[in-house]
Every structure is written in C-alpha cells, then in structure tokens.
From Swiss-Prot:
Organism: Legionella pneumophila (strain Lens)
Principal location class: membrane
Domain of life: Bacteria
This protein's record includes keyword RNA-binding: no
Cell inner membrane listed as a keyword: yes
Domain ABC transporter: 6-227
Name of protein: Lipoprotein-releasing system ATP-binding protein LolD
Record GO cellular component, one term: plasma membrane
Length: 227
C-alpha cells in the first residue's frame, strides 16, 4: 500500500521583479506520507510560505510536478482544485482567518457545508470536533469573544473537521505567547497522532521543529534534511 499522499518533483518557482528574475525555489523534491510530522525551517524570505502555497494548490509553480494522491495539481481547473483542497487538505495560518460575524460552530462548519454535507450532520460533527479541542463551552462565541489561543484552536478544528490527509500550517503559533503556543502545538500533535493526518509546519520556532519527526531546511531555493 502506497502511503504517499502529497509530493513535489523538481519544483521551481520564480518571480519577475521589473527587469530581474528572482528564483525562490530551485528543484524542490518532497514526499509526504500518511501521519508524517514535518517541520520546514529556514531564513525569512527563503520561500517557506511559497512552498506551502504550492503544495496546497494555492499558487502555481514555474515548472515541476505536484501531486495530491494521484492527481496532478497542474492538470485540473480551479474549481477542481478547490474541491480537492476541501476534501484532502487542511490549512492553519499564523492569523486564524476566522469569519468575525460567525460563531465558532459556524466557522468550523464551513468546509463541511461547502462539501455538501447536511446542516444537521455538519453541526453534529463540528460539536464533536470542538469538544476534542476543548472548546465545547464556546460553541456560540464569535472570534472577538475568544482569546488568541481559543481562536487558533477553532482554526485547527476547522482544518481537521473533514479529516484531511494532510494539514499545512504556516507559523500556526507565531502570534501566541510561549505558554499558549505550547498548548496549541501539543493539541496539533495529539490530533495528528489520533487522526493519522500528515502535519507539515513552517516555523521559526526551534522548539517546535525539534518535536517533529523530520526537519527540512529551505535555503537558497533548495530543500534538504537538517543534519
């Protein structure tokens, strides 16, 4: 059985800046398997977020191949990419990106409703998910009524509620104080293990990186395992 769920092969990404071309990624190869815990570290501006966006189908590479399951990102249209993302990937960012006018329950229901799940079934599933992240008493609270750590836990619940194959997280604890960041990260690892969902985290926090199974360094466009 092939447990590889997301791959990049010979991935290049460059941007044109006036008369010059900036090469951000230079032939990046990466294979992510079920249940993986991967940290991607590197200097600011090295292209870590760019790589995450490419893996998630949020941006297109200059050249190279990205596959999610057996699907080539570049061979499908935007509607199909959205459907595939919603089915198989979860995203967590430094800023929670919760919709301010909706409650925690409603925010986490969004990916399920977009996938066509009935409201009653989605609500039941979300209540269970929010209970797992310790927020059942906060179901009807809007983002402004939640602490920073609680908002990020809602974002994690939203990323995991549809049981994706892989979660891509970009500095998920970057806006939190040390104690809260540690609790949020503990929760992510717990759910990663419980759900066997691959977890790929871009981080500057060495303490977080040390707790992952693999630490990859992105430097001058190349991705390699840290020695």
């Amino acid at each position: 059985m092939n447990d590889i769920i997301l791959t990049s092969q010979k991935l290049y990404k460059s941007y044109h800046d006036g008369t010059s071309t900036v090469e951000v990624l230079k032939g990046v190869d990466l294979a992510i398997t079920k249940g993986d815990r991967i940290a991607i570290i590197g200097p600011s501006g090295s292209g870590k977020s760019t790589l995450l966006h490419l893996l998630g189908g949020l941006d297109k590479p200059t050249s190279g191949l990205i596959t999610l399951g057996n699907v080539n990102w570049q061979k499908i249209n935007e509607k199909q990419r959205c459907q595939l993302r919603n089915q198989q990937l979860g995203f967590v960012y430094q800023f929670h990106h919760l919709l301010p006018e909706f409650t925690a329950l409603e925010n986490v229901m969004m990916p399920l409703l977009l996938a066509g799940m009935a409201v009653k079934d989605a609500e039941e599933k979300v209540i269970n998910m929010l209970e797992q992240v310790g927020l059942k008493p906060r179901l009807t609270h809007k983002p402004a009524q939640l602490s920073g750590g609680e908002r990020q836990r809602v974002a994690i619940a939203r990323a995991l509620v549809h049981q994706p194959h892989c979660v891509l997280a970009d500095e998920p604890t970057g806006n939190l104080d040390e104690a809260t960041a540690s609790k949020v990260f503990d929760l992510m690892l717990e759910l990663n293990k419980k759900m066997n969902t691959a977890l790929v985290i871009v981080t500057h926090d060495q303490r977080i990186a040390e707790r992952m199974d693999r630490v990859l360094v992105l430097h001058e466009g190349s991705l390699y395992a840290r020695e």
